């Protein structure tokens, strides 16, 4: 029984580390966005504000929606989604958008924190990635963050 307990503890520890990265990302992206804001944006690329607006849209339209789907449907099916920049509150500016992203991300992380064991075990089917449980969705969220952080480097 001890090896199983150690494995479960390891999985939980890895999940907690991913949740920590998800929660800390608003500060990480804020620093990167402020550094990038002083440089010209290459043609065809998003400005730092547009990247952060995109991250808001992804949290609202993808991450939070899929977590709600897991709670409401037996086995939800998800398509590939890559929303553009969040269009609301156009006058916010970079700092305002970063603040909004922090609030939205806090809500997303909160949705993960309220999951019980059954919630973490529920699964849906993604047309590209196959079966995903809540931890699989969390992995995708962290990977997506890192991808966009790299674009501001």
Model segments located where?
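Extreme N-terminal tail/first-helix region
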Residues: 1-24
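Short, contiguous alpha-helical
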Residues: 1-8, 38-81, 123-153
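Acidic/His metal-coordination segments adjacent to aromatic residues that form catalytic metal sites
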Residues: 10-13, 84-97, 128-136
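Short alpha-helical segments used as structural interaction elements across diverse proteins
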Residues: 12-15, 50, 63, 102
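Hydrophobic alpha-helical segments and helix-packing faces
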Residues: 15-18, 22, 44-48, 60, ...
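Short secondary-structure transition/capping motifs
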Residues: 18, 52-56, 97
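Acidic/histidine-rich alpha-helical segments that form the ligand environment
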Residues: 21-22, 26-32, 83-122, 141
